[in-house]
Amino acid sequence: MNKKVIAIVVGVVVVLVAILGVVAWFVPILKVGNIEVTGATRTDPDQVLEVSGIVEGENLFRVDATAAGQNIVELPWVKSVTVNRALPSTITVELTEREPAVFIKRADGDHVIDTEGKEIIIGTPPVGTVEVSGADEGNSEVLPAVIAVINAIKAQDAQMTESIQVVEAPDQFDILLKMNDGREIYWGSSENNHDKAVAMSTVLKREGQRWNISSPSMVTVR
């Protein structure tokens, strides 16, 4: 087969592919028959479908995945989303949800904050979310400091956060953990959080009602 014939064959193939592409775009040969939502733990999948704007039966190739993703990521629990086509008839929607860390009671309800310090919802806090009390609304540094503490505790042992009843934090330098069993652990400032989390895991195994781990190398009890 000489070069001229090869060129003709390639040209024909290119034209056919282009024609098929145009036909697939304007004629709904492949339709959306199924929309799969994964990663929706706290987000209602039906709500995801509704805001996505994608409907079953529409042309698969004309689905605006970018616009759908932009709409979905506006839902409160959604941190990020990926929308893809899966031939012959499926749209996949993969969610990554925000992880709640703390909540704080305000006049308009409980404000649930994620591990990055962003407010998720005003409503019922999920199980395992730690309450923060005493924080000055005008001090923007308190909640990030407390969240850094909670993240360090989770990294050391996630079960330890479940034993915290409330965190009292009038400011970012004066953090006190009140435990479900009545014990108190004074954390102090949001510094050396890893070392303090290690110290916390140790003191929780010992007797004593009031522990001070603000200096993790010199833990005291009274």
Swiss-Prot record:
Q: List the GO cellular component terms.
A: cell division site; plasma membrane
Q: Which residues form the POTRA domain?
A: 30-98
Where mainly located?
membrane
Q: Where in the cell is it found?
A: Cell membrane
KW Transmembrane helix (keyword) present: yes
List the membrane topology term(s).
Single-pass type II membrane protein
Tell me where the transmembrane regions lie. Answer: 6-26
Q: Which residues lie on this side of the membrane: Extracellular?
A: 27-222
The residue ranges for the Cytoplasmic side of the membrane come to 1-5
Can you supply a Gene Ontology BP term from the record?
FtsZ-dependent cytokinesis
Gene3D superfamilies recorded = membrane protein fhac
What are the entry keywords? Cell cycle, Cell division, Cell membrane, Membrane, Transmembrane, Transmembrane helix
Q: Which InterPro entries match?
A: FtsQ, FtsQ_DivIB, POTRA, POTRA_FtsQ_type
Q: Which family does it belong to?
A: Belongs to the FtsQ/DivIB family. FtsQ subfamily.
Role: Essential cell division protein.
User: Which named protein is this?
Assistant: Cell division protein FtsQ
Q: Please name the source species.
A: Corynebacterium glutamicum (strain ATCC 13032 / DSM 20300 / JCM 1318 / BCRC 11384 / CCUG 27702 / LMG 3730 / NBRC 12168 / NCIMB 10025 / NRRL B-2784 / 534)
Gene name linked to the record: ftsQ
